[in-house]
């Protein structure tokens, strides 16, 4: 899970949490926290694609010359399978026979749950693994007795890729006022805020 979260950090240019933090969540919430992961068996898919490729070559060899439409379709399939084989072979070299492509970390409390973190390996975006992973995550929440499953926030404009993705699950959107600070001591707040900014600037330099 930590690996796919690192992929998300790199893709978005942000810093999220450490592996130790995710472990702390799981330890703290125990049976009320779980991770859902999706794996892609590259080696199996490579083997299956090679078998399809061999059959395609056989069909091409036995395709009549006057069957132009069928031959054209087979030629296109041949090119597509060659590209897939090349891609899968590269993936096996990079990731091995099996790779985790995406995952979620969820915490349950009361009759609801929060999908707190979700990550995806961009190299396998084409598989659209998050769609099934999120579905299975929410399915698990309902099996545990939850009446709702919080999918997290979206853009305020109700536009963008995140909205398009979450819209598939027919969510109910709740709009809140947002985050803000209410200083109970103006003097201490100003001092603390300046100190906080300096720490952030220092940490940013060391990354």
Task: Locate each region found by the language model.
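Acyl-donor binding region in acyl/amide transferases
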Residues: 96-171
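Short amphipathic alpha-helical patches
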Residues: 24-32, 45-53, 139, 164-165, ...
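Aromatic-enriched hydrophobic runs in primary sequence
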Residues: 3, 9-10, 18-19, 112, ...
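Short C-terminal domain-edge/linker segments immediately following a structured domain
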Residues: 20-24, 67-69, 134-138, 145-149, ...
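Active-site/acyl-donor-binding loops of N-acyltransferases
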Residues: 144-207
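A conserved beta-strand-loop-helix scaffold within acyl/acetyltransferase catalytic domains
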Residues: 1-125
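Glycine-rich loops and low-complexity Gly/Arg-rich segments
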Residues: 13-17, 60-64, 130-131, 139-141, ...
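General N-terminal targeting signals
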Residues: 18, 39, 53-55, 118, ...
């Amino acid at each position: 899970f930590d690996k796919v979260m690192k992929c998300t950090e790199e893709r978005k240019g942000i810093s999220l949490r450490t592996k130790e933090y995710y472990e702390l969540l799981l330890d703290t919430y125990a049976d009320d926290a779980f991770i859902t992961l999706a794996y892609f068996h590259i080696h199996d898919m490579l083997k299956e694609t090679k078998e399809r490729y061999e059959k395609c070559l056989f069909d091409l060899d036995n395709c009549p010359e006057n069957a132009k439409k069928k031959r054209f379709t087979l030629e296109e399939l041949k090119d597509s399978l060659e590209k897939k084989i090349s891609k899968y072979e590269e993936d096996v070299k990079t990731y091995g026979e099996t790779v985790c492509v995406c995952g979620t970390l969820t915490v349950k409390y009361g009759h609801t749950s929060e999908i707190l973190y979700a990550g995806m390996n961009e190299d396998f975006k084409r598989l659209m693994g998050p769609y099934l992973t999120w579905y299975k995550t929410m399915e698990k929440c309902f099996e545990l007795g939850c009446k709702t499953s919080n999918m997290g926030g979206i853009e305020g404009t109700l536009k963008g890729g995140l909205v398009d993705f979450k819209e598939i699950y027919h969510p109910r959107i709740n709009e809140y006022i947002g985050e803000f600070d209410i200083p109970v001591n103006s003097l201490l707040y100003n001092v603390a805020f300046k100190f906080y900014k300096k720490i952030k600037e220092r940490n940013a330099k060391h990354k």
